[in-house]
């Protein structure tokens, strides 16, 4: 199953996340198909960028969002 979820980037105690499309069987930071955005929870305004067009495309072909990405995308 194809998932839209976050992969951790950054350094120790300074997380930064990419929002990516990947196979659900891959590890959290394993290979991914496409990066469609990023999320920075450390910045003052919790910066979130998301390519809505690509998100809608992947949802239309059957990709499922992780609960965290679903929550973040709903706020945007």
Curated annotation (Swiss-Prot):
GO molecular function: structural constituent of ribosome
Presence of the UniProt keyword Lipid biosynthesis in the record: no
Keyword Transferase among UniProt keywords: no
Keywords: Ribonucleoprotein, Ribosomal protein
Pfam family, one: Ribosomal_S16
This protein's GO CC annotations: cytoplasm; small ribosomal subunit
GO biological process: translation
Annotated HAMAP family: Ribosomal_bS16 (MF_00385)
Family assignment from sequence similarity: Belongs to the bacterial ribosomal protein bS16 family.
The protein, known as: Small ribosomal subunit protein bS16
Highest classification ranks of the organism: Bacteria, Pseudomonadati, Campylobacterota, Epsilonproteobacteria, Campylobacterales
């Amino acid at each position: 199953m194809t998932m839209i979820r976050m992969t951790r980037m950054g350094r120790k105690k300074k997380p930064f996340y990419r929002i990516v499309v990947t196979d659900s069987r891959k590890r959290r930071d394993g290979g991914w198909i496409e990066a469609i955005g990023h999320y920075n929870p450390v910045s003052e305004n919790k910066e979130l960028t998301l390519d809505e067009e690509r998100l809608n495309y992947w949802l239309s072909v059957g990709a499922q969002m992780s609960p965290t990405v679903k929550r973040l995308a709903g706020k945007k």
